[in-house]
Amino acid sequence: MWSLDHTMMRVEDLDASLDWYQTYFDYEEKGRWEADTFTNVFLGPEDVHDDGALLELTYNHDGRSYTMGDAWGHIAVRCDDVYEAYDELMDAGVEDYRDPDSCGGSYAFVTDPDGHEIEIVERDHGAKWSLDHTMIRVEDAEQAIGWYTRKLDYDLFRREEFDDFALYFLKPENAPEEAMSVELTYNYDGRSYELGDAWGHLAVRTDDLHSAWETLMGRHAEDYRDPESCDDRYAFTKDPDAREIEIVTN
């Protein structure tokens, strides 16, 4: 219950974004929803794990533009060797953004056509380019950790604390290594963040939408968009930083 299902981001040119992810990350289309005013496309590696997460691209047909904000940080994708993976992307034509040497040799970053940051991390598990984590910035670490652990039963399985910031990684108890985690970044200087609208939501999956919603309401999660308001197909709550969390069914 509550496994991370996907991360949604909004794109201004669907064809350009699909071409980018399919060309450079070898992603394939896993699902598509064509509505009158928008299109949602779900992407992931061919051999994504059953408990792995997908990337959802949302394209609104009215040609709107988006602001990135700074409350969302990045998605991270897996590879065996960060230097080899970065060189592969550079040779294929991806723009040079933050190479491994500029990141201490342990990770790197590129950006997609809309400017969403994508971290490249070394892992000994999961399909190449599969989603490892999604990073979000939080204004109160204790409150955010408490929300994800109490509302979603997540475990804090990794923490890194530095002089001026800290990183906390959470995902469901007993989740496989291949499952995506959420990374909470907390800066000690008390700064505030803007959500923007280039990022949409995190989605968690459950077996029973209505039972899950009742559990969340019993744990005093925000009643934002209940199942009935979403045609009993999904629902939305929000975390303490007003970030949307979608609930979907397996």
Where are these regions (language model features)?
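Core segments of cupin and vicinal oxygen chelate
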Residues: 2, 8-52, 136-182
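Acidic/His-leaning functional-site neighborhoods
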Residues: 181, 185, 193, 212
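Active-site/binding-pocket entry motifs
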Residues: 49, 62-64, 175-176, 189-191
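Vicinal oxygen chelate
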Residues: 6, 31-32, 42, 77, ...
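Residues at or immediately preceding the N-termini of alpha-helices
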Residues: 14, 82, 141, 209-210
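Short glycine-enriched loop/turn motifs at secondary-structure junctions
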Residues: 1-3, 67-72, 102, 128-130, ...
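Acetyl-CoA-dependent GNAT
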Residues: 59-61, 122-125, 186-188, 250
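Short, structured motif recognition centered on aromatic/hydrophobic residues
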Residues: 54-57, 72, 131, 182-184, ...
